[in-house]
């Protein structure tokens, strides 16, 4: 049990080391495989790339950059020692926030793009261009990197355990929370969470309303079902991954600044923080599902790959069957010749 900085409330968060180690290991394996496959399809399989694909490529790159830092985090949470230096600690922290809020903003870009394509298909043609999509992506990268810079500035390694080990990713001091971090959290939550959340819900609602209008009722039922699945998957992943962490981050900020002085509330919030963070990190594994339901080309590429694999397997089976048939006939012929020679 340790006491919160400047607080009389004891808490024990040692469980987070095991939780982080297990969760980050799983995210590393699944996230690395799924996002590498996604990048391969985007670069090698897609012959025509549109503005939506541009957002998805940047989202996959954001996921991969964060996934590459996970082995260092896994090592730290397993050994509780950071031997990789202060710079890599700062880079790992920056890529965590860059990935989380970059994912939120890129998913929002995909949602807004879908909204423009369905609700204003003709008026939005001048807006929905690959050039504009690239400009938006550059703006997103600058925004998330600028927003994560203060956290990187305050995060650094420090000695622990009688100077026998180095710590990284540990809690900031209470004084830092009161003076700087609480204001940074307000900015991050408004720009990086609440505005994107409102945009996602609003755009999805207007798309659903447009699809139910008499003018669009003539659309094929299959197309409508596909759009509904797309919206459902998008919102579920967005809300599941990011809502718990960001709501808890607000409460966590209030606890660390001692706005909440209730020990029970503080303990609950501190306990939920590592859990919600693990849920948020899992977005690296779920983002490829968004790619699948958003892009017909990706669906077709995966189906073609699986079809070609099945076809090659069937060809192999046919060849193997033919070889077995030939071998059987040769053996039969050999036996007949041997019987005839024996009779002579």
UniProtKB/Swiss-Prot annotation:
Disulfide linkage: 89-168
Annotated compartments: Membrane
Record key words, sorted: Disulfide bond, G-protein coupled receptor, Glycoprotein, Membrane, Receptor, Transducer, Transmembrane, Transmembrane helix
Glycosylation sites per record: 162
Spans through the membrane: 26-46, 57-77, 91-111, 135-155, 184-204, 231-251, 273-293
Sequence ranges on the Extracellular membrane side: 1-25, 78-90, 156-183, 252-272
Entry's Gene Ontology BP terms: blastocyst hatching; G protein-coupled receptor signaling pathway
Key word Ribosomal protein present: no
Biological role: Binds to oleoyl-L-alpha-lysophosphatidic acid (LPA). Intracellular cAMP is involved in the receptor activation. Important for the maintenance of hair growth and texture.
The protein's name: Lysophosphatidic acid receptor 6
Organism: Rattus norvegicus
């Amino acid at each position: 049990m340790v006491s919160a900085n400047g607080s009389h409330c004891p808490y024990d968060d040692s469980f987070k080391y095991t939780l982080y180690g297990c969760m980050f290991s799983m995210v590393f394996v699944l996230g690395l495989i799924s996002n590498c496959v996604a990048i391969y399809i985007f670069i090698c399989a897609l012959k025509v790339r549109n503005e939506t694909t541009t957002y998805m490529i940047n989202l996959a790159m954001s996921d991969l950059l964060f996934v590459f830092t996970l082995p260092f985090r896994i090592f730290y949470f397993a050994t509780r020692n950071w031997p990789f230096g202060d710079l890599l600690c700062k880079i790992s922290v920056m890529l965590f926030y860059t990935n989380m809020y970059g994912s939120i903003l890129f998913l929002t870009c995909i949602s807004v793009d879908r909204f423009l394509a369905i609700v204003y298909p003709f008026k939005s043609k001048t807006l929905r261009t690959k050039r504009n999509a690239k400009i938006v992506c550059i703006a997103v990268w600058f925004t998330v990197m600028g927003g994560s810079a203060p956290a990187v500035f305050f995060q650094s390694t420090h000695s622990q355990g009688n100077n026998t080990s180095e710590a990284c990713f540990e809690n900031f001091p209470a004084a830092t929370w009161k003076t700087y971090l609480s204001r940074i959290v307000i900015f991050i939550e408004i720009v990086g969470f609440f505005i994107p959340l409102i945009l996602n819900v609003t755009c999805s609602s207007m798309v659903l309303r447009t699809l139910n209008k008499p003018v669009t009722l003539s659309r094929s039922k299959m197309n409508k079902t596909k759009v509904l699945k797309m919206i459902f998957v998008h919102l579920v992943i967005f809300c599941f991954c990011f809502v718990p962490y960001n709501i808890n981050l607000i409460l966590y900020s209030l606890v660390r600044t001692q706005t909440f002085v209730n020990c029970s509330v503080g303990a609950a919030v501190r306990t939920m923080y590592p859990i919600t963070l693990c849920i948020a990190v899992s977005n690296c594994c779920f983002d490829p599902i968004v790619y699948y339901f958003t892009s017909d080309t990706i669906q077709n590429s995966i189906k073609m790959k699986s079809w070609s694999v099945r076809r090659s397997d069937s060809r192999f089976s046919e060849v193997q069957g033919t070889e077995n048939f030939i071998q059987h006939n040769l053996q039969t012929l050999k036996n007949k010749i041997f019987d005839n020679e024996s009779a002579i």
